[in-house]
């Protein structure tokens, strides 16, 4: 035993074991011991000689490995298999080669051992021999080489050699004289002649390359009468093209000729599978050869010969000719050539395969790898089963073994049974499973498992998911498949005999139904090529009857043309009824049909090629339809299955029906195309109409066009039954029509959904517009012909983001307005087309901006919201136009731009005039402003002062920025123009400031930039708004600096210049909205901003977050509202401001901080409230991140931002600001009124405003110094105006509407988390709110609640709300007109007062900003629902009413707003708090209450 156990070292394998006491275990144990007597005794008991151990090793393998010659002889004599595969793929031949014993190896080779086999590592016996060591390997390798040489000589015709050397034993070198005695078996003696009855007896020889014999004395043949031929004997036919097709993952079959016989040769093809072991895969052919040599059946592909290469390394199998190819290629790769498989053909093919499978089972074989690859269609209607390389053979012990250990390729998992995939024992039930899968595949035209990768299928099965029967299967076949696809083998109750019985009965019934049609010969026509899809159904190509003979011969002629014309990877193409390009089909040879069909074919192929996923008619559906047609042909009254319409009457009626159906199909096609166009236009980027859907649609649409070629080719169908033809066409057309109907239904559903979305967006926009109009009470002031916009060039009109922003912000009203005009007509996603369009306008606006900034601002601003006025005008016009002219968006927007430009110019002059008029009132306003400033300062000092929404403005800017962000390209240009305008404005401001004085320059610049920059800056205002905000902080900084030094003024000029540049844009937009002219408020806004900067410093991050949230909310709103656009623009601006302005402010922040510290000191010296006022009116000038940094850098600053841009002189600033504010209020009210009134009016007002702005710009040049201070105001005004655009037109209306709407809006827009976070942040950083503020907050809450109710009512009554808002706006506009006129008169009177008014205006603007943030908040909220919009609108209406009342008292109201002492101011702080812009504690309380509400 010890001797037997000792293995040669190094041994390539280990020996397995058997742990039981069975005879097999004893046999293995005795073999290891080398006990010949006991082994023979056990063998005599009839034990299974090839019983395996734990490693799959047989007793013969162990004996050969250990070199036990006698045991090998006895085991072979008892029938041990020399080629039995161990689990590692090795065979006893490998073991013998390793043992180094030539006798053992020769014995195994004589018994049929094969030297070509490989183990799982690709090692053949020669490799094993070399592993044994040089001493033993040399002899073994030489022996194997002699065997190979002998075999080669025999193959080459030297058969006489067999007479001398008939056994490998005779090739052993150094055979002992008494070798026969040494073998232990007289039959194994190499010296004795072969004797009949033994393995090497008679004519059977084996030299390690398969058992063969000589036929006719010379021809070498393998067992099974398989001639062994050389490679040169198989050649390509010269009368047919090369035709190759895949017969599985690793095999390729090629049509060749052997000795004049047309054959198909199978060979290994691993080029596409480089990771597979070519050496090991070669064993597959050997295994199939051995299996095929034992099988003979009419439906098993007949192996005719074996082709060996000269070096015996390569084997090719020669089969009978396969004319068509595999079933897989017919169903999935070349379906165009076989548009329809008749049902009787399908059943006939399935019966043939089931017969062959039953034959295999009867012989003890299990196919295991049955798939559509293994079914070869040798000719029309004739199928053969092949691919036997993975087949397993039953053994005596009942187990099955395969000739190779090659695992089943994952590519075949789609058809394999679960037990085969997970490598468990396979049975005949496994083949039934695979057969059921094929039945489903051929009837549904779908690859099993939808073509999933094998590895995925295996994972799916392991996870407990299995393939299920397709419910589309016909009844009898559904039962078959359902039973066969059961997971457990025992549940597959149907056997092949049952399946065959069901199929035969079904075929009989089917054929019996067809016998009434003598003209029908579907079987002959089964595989005809049909370039015309209309004849697909019957496979009745419209060729003359000669085509029935199109069988093998014609298919041969087509040859490789058949091969996968659609590509190997387009299995789904099969589903398309479209025929291949006519050239592909032999039928194409008929030119008359070619000409007729080629157009349709080309279209069909084009339709197919785009999407392999196209799901046109499935073959089984066509088959059913065809079957139904056959039935209906017999019984015209019977309905075609699945068509739902009875085909009645004679051929004439059918012809009429066919024509009518074709016409209907064409109509449907056009409708589908139209709907598709609409759908595409409605959303260029919309994925609702996916590419697959589109391709599928195209595919289906192509089919209706085919009837025309079919009609053209009708002449060729003389020999066919007209009834059959018409029925086929009608059925196909009906099926296509059904498909088109489904497509149309889907498209209509998608379009309807989009339309509903657009309607909702439009409603929201309309509500927002009305809300916005109501908030912009100045819209009602459109009556006043002169625009009283802020003179400061730095004035930043509320950026009403134009279509670009609107596009950017699907929720923004502005976006929606501009977008809706485009979107409505196009049905495009509101943001997509309009976005693209707006981007284009924006680019154009860039160029235009360079040419004419005013004009560019208008044009660009519109796409970019660069010009709030133009945006507002366009928005109003869009709001008005969109409903009436959804498709006129470009027109309306263009007019909006033009009108914006014109109105900007005219309004500029008007604003300047109003400014002059306001200068007169400047003194009073200034005084009031001072008083208010003092009050506000006191409040700020005590922590009770409500900080103007510098953050709100930033929030608005952020929102608008967010909106602009959606329009990045336009935004960039806008920013560029903005910077250009800003620089120019800054330069101009510097010039004007130097000569004219800060206040005067501020006014002049304000007006000038408003007018002059209004056009370009309208465009830039969108971009500039961010700089403007940046500049605004600079402005506040500059105002302080201006009071401190001219350098600060210059800085403010540069900053304001940008701001004013933005502001003119904004003012242009605002002129459209009329809110843009809130420069005074802008100044006031700076004051507020100063306060808010304090708040920002304390809570700017939260505010930023809040603003970001507002921006996020505003974006949805922006699409619906200009307010949102303004907010979006503001958001962009504030983002830009936050980035450039606030970040720059960061650098300036230190200076600003110093400036703030110093100016506040001076202010404190003058008036302690000035610091608070500065806090309110000044804005930190950090351009890059001052906004964020301010909040972070100076969280503990009481109220002043790091840098104050508000002039130190509260009186002059307040007067100027008041004048500006009044002018702006009146102008914005006019614009708002105009916008709400009509697009044309708003456009005209925009034009007028543009003109005014132009004149104002020109005048502003002289007022550069004033503009410095006023620029800051305009910047804030721009923000405020933006806010007014959202909230109200006038500062008062803004203050009121924003207060109420802000509270409600903030409540709605601010998320609880955000509010809580902001509140907490503010709580941490800010002092507790005063009782007065709390009271105000409660009052505001009540107003909000009422406004919410109003909003709901408004939502239900948006029209009335808009009217009310317009009315309120008009009222406010009148009051604002008065105020603005007074303010402008005052401004004209006193430049210093203008500066002061600018401050006051800034304060007022700050108030407006504070309110606009609410609007901004409302805007974000508005997207949440029309109710909110309505409520915001109602709130704004109420606020506007209050504003109108206050506007009647412009001086009084302004000071209040500026100082924040007024009730509005208190409300504003509440709103600010809610927004998180004001003191955190207040905000927290308001936010919490709002949230709780």
UniProtKB/Swiss-Prot annotation:
Residue positions of motif D-box: 846-854
Motif GPPX3Y mapped to chain: 789-795
Subcellular compartments: Cytoplasm; Midbody; Chromosome, Centromere, Kinetochore
GO biological process: attachment of spindle microtubules to kinetochore; cell division; intercellular bridge organization; male meiotic nuclear division; mitotic sister chromatid separation; mitotic spindle assembly checkpoint signaling
Compositional bias ranges of the Acidic residues kind: 1066-1075
PTM comment, free text: Phosphorylated on Thr residues by CDK1 during early phases of mitosis, promoting the interaction with PLK1 and recruitment to kinetochores. Phosphorylated on Ser-430 by PLK1 during late prometaphase promotes the rapid depletion from kinetochores and its subsequent degradation by the APC/C complex.
Disulfide feature: none
Chain positions found as Phosphoserine: 430, 560, 660, 1100, 1262, 1400, 1492
Matching Pfam families: Ank_2 (PF12796), PK_Tyr_Ser-Thr (PF07714)
Ranges where the Protein kinase domain occurs: 198-511
Compositionally skewed regions (Polar residues) per UniProt: 559-573, 855-904, 1001-1020, 1053-1064, 1131-1144, 1343-1362
ANK-type repeats, residues: 27-54, 55-84, 88-117
Keywords: ANK repeat, ATP-binding, Cell cycle, Cell division, Centromere, Chromosome, Cytoplasm, Kinetochore, Mitosis, Nucleotide-binding, Phosphoprotein, Repeat
UniProt entry tagged with the keyword Cytoplasm: yes
Basic and acidic residues: bias regions: 1026-1037, 1154-1167, 1363-1380, 1426-1456
Location of the region described as Disordered in the Swiss-Prot/TrEMBL record: 559-615, 782-904, 940-1081, 1115-1167, 1288-1307, 1341-1466
Job description of the protein: Required both for the formation of intercellular bridges during meiosis and for kinetochore-microtubule attachment during mitosis. Intercellular bridges are evolutionarily conserved structures that connect differentiating germ cells and are required for spermatogenesis and male fertility. Acts by promoting the conversion of midbodies into intercellular bridges via its interaction with CEP55: interaction with CEP55 inhibits the interaction between CEP55 and PDCD6IP/ALIX and TSG101, blocking cell abscission and leading to transform midbodies into intercellular bridges.
Domain free text: The protein kinase domain is predicted to be catalytically inactive.
Complex and partners: Interacts with KIF23 and RBM44. Interacts with CEP55; inhibiting interaction between CEP55 and PDCD6IP/ALIX and TSG101.
Protein name, per record: Inactive serine/threonine-protein kinase TEX14
Classification of source organism: Eukaryota, Metazoa, Chordata, Craniata, Vertebrata
Gene name tied to this protein: TEX14
